[in-house]
Design a protein with these regions (language model features):
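N-terminal beta-strand-loop-alpha-helix module at the start
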Residues: 2-66
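A glycine-rich helix N-cap at a beta->alpha junction
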Residues: 74-100
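Short Gly/Thr/Asp-enriched flexible loops that form oxyanion-binding sites at enzyme active sites
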Residues: 128-141
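Short, acidic/small-residue loops that bind anionic groups at enzyme active sites
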Residues: 139-158
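Anionic-ligand binding region
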Residues: 161-172
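A charged, well-structured terminal subsegment
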Residues: 176-204
Length: 218
């Protein structure tokens, strides 16, 4: 049994180390003054995807990110850890997109990719803390969603079911859902594995697919 997994990932400014130049006069983040990193909870999500790849031979893990050209850096980071490929959704038309526009763009890109069992991403990005994009993507695709996930326990593709442990107030619960499905992962999930030196060498000249706004029009 093999799975097709799409990991939603975002490059974000590192708001954990905020200096005096981190904010603009209008109260927005000065992204140029902060280092860009792989959103932490998206790394937790990537680890869950890679564990499924380890468990189910033939499984592929594909990263999907939206942003300017430099956002391709997180595709490289994913490849260095064991992902198989990536799509960069980039266009001036996406500049300043809110969560509604972002989720629409991601959902239309996913429809174009059109080969997935699991769509997984972090619960929220540290530059917005909205936790809206994952659920909105699920809604736009008409898929079931499981949020606040800590661990994927089992996948039965023949039965079309997945079992997930998720965090709730005061404890955890185990839930099942149908495939395909959208899952968002908490920061309390297992941290992502480090880079693999052999993969770093392999993907020095990384190849990934650019998608523009007109290519995802539905």
């Amino acid at each position: 049994m093999s799975l097709r997994i799409i990991v939603l990932a975002k490059q974000v400014p590192d708001t954990r180390n905020v200096g005096k130049d981190a904010m603009k006069a209008d109260g927005t983040i000065n992204r140029a003054a902060l280092p860009a990193i792989f959103n932490p909870e998206d790394l937790n999500a990537l680890e869950q995807a890679l564990r499924l790849k380890d468990a189910y031979p033939g499984t592929t893990v594909t990263l999907l990110t939206m942003g300017p050209g430099r956002a391709a850096e997180i595709i490289r980071e994913g490849l260095y850890r064991g992902a198989d490929g990536g799509f960069l959704l980039t266009d001036r038309a996406f500049a300043g997109a809110d969560t509604l526009a972002t989720s629409y763009a991601l959902a239309t890109a996913i429809k174009k990719i059109n080969d997935y069992d699991i769509i997984i991403g972090g619960r929220q990005a540290i530059d917005g803390d909205t936790a809206q994009v994952g659920p909105q993507v699920a809604e736009k695709l008409g898929l079931t969603q499981i949020t606040y996930a800590e661990e994927i326990l089992n996948v039965d593709k023949e039965a079309g079911r997945i079992t997930v442990k998720r965090h709730i107030d005061g404890g955890v619960e185990t839930v099942e859902g149908p495939l395909p499905i959208v899952i968002t992962v908490n920061g309390s999930a297992a941290p992502c594995r480090p880079r693999n030196a052999k993969l770093v060498q392999k993907y020095k000249s990384v190849s990934y697919t650019h998608l523009r706004a007109h290519e995802t029009d539905q």
